[in-house]
């Protein structure tokens, strides 16, 4: 029985209790959210060491980190090092987007070592296996694709990105439009090439019930991918993007009817003033399904700093109702991220998520900031570092810039505003 079916039957599962504990909410609140589909708990029955987390309405905004090999860098050990960074940096989920090396072996090791939800994009592996075995990615059959989907699910993957909303009708609209970047989704581009070459409908759409049966078997959450997400600001919120979203909303209904949990993925590159509208349209068309956004990036001109452009957009998106942020690293649009890139990307997205949670009124969000303010007022450096979203970085900078442990920071020194004002207000801060 899936989490959704259990919730509808009135059962509060162990996973629901754990999510409630983490969120500081009642188990009944979580059960109701899962039952109606506004909350998902990705928790494959075969992911044995998972510490479940919930995404959705009324919960803290969550952060995903992407790792995985490429055709140029196939070392799974390096990706497992990234997984350690992902866990240490506090991400809530990780996606293995591997496209090189021993993909099955790497995925299984990531699942084995990950205590957070693991997601994948099965179509990557299906196309690559066909290229290697038959000499062409477009030699893939629908059976090939669903075999890989089941392989991922049976291994213990908690959620899968599937680009079900790209249909032949939608592609006709793309042809008529004047997009600058056309299709930037890797899975979306693979499917588009296959569909146009064969003149056939998207098997993930055409055989959606088959997909649901696999997810039902392992309690895998669907992450309905936005294969037509905008790849630049100029392409944002166009007809093709919205048409795909309409289809995804219809598929959310079908998944819920079957008892399969579903969330929806979103853009992408979006001008700041269009972000709220994108969230509101998704929440309406998809009937409150959790929204998982990539960024959104609010400008196209900042390669090397796209973790910042994504954090800006992610804050606005989450404050408007997005539930789950996919991190973007400084290496976005440039290359495979390093360990430090992964850490920076997670921290940028976590900052965005927390800033939005304050606006959302999430329990405990503002209190965290109040605790930091009190620690700063008291010049309590140990407490400030303890409360920092990245204590490791805060401690490092403090030690490097103030090795002698002076009470004030080296920015203000004897002219510390906290000390001066406290002196005249009769509220002398305690020495750290």
Curated annotation (Swiss-Prot):
UniProt KW keywords: 4Fe-4S, Iron, Iron-sulfur, Lyase, Metal-binding, S-adenosyl-L-methionine, Thiamine biosynthesis, Zinc
Catalytic activity: 5-amino-1-(5-phospho-beta-D-ribosyl)imidazole + S-adenosyl-L-methionine = 4-amino-2-methyl-5-(phosphooxymethyl)pyrimidine + CO + 5'-deoxyadenosine + formate + L-methionine + 3 H(+)
Names of required cofactors: [4Fe-4S] cluster
GO biological process, one term: thiamine diphosphate biosynthetic process
Binding site for [4Fe-4S] cluster: 409, 412, 416
Residues annotated for substrate binding in this entry: 66, 95, 124, 163, 185-187, 226-229, 265, 292
GO molecular function: 4 iron, 4 sulfur cluster binding; carbon-carbon lyase activity; zinc ion binding
Residues noted as binding Zn(2+) in the record, renumbered to the chain: 269, 333
Cofactor note: Binds 1 [4Fe-4S] cluster per subunit. The cluster is coordinated with 3 cysteines and an exchangeable S-adenosyl-L-methionine.
Pathway per the UniProt entry: Cofactor biosynthesis; thiamine diphosphate biosynthesis
EC number(s) reported in the record: 4.1.99.17
Family note: Belongs to the ThiC family.
HAMAP family from the UniProt entry: ThiC
Chain's role: Catalyzes the synthesis of the hydroxymethylpyrimidine phosphate (HMP-P) moiety of thiamine from aminoimidazole ribotide (AIR) in a radical S-adenosyl-L-methionine (SAM)-dependent reaction.
PANTHER family, A to Z: PHOSPHOMETHYLPYRIMIDINE SYNTHASE, CHLOROPLASTIC (PTHR30557:SF1), THIAMINE BIOSYNTHESIS PROTEIN THIC (PTHR30557)
Descriptive protein name: Phosphomethylpyrimidine synthase
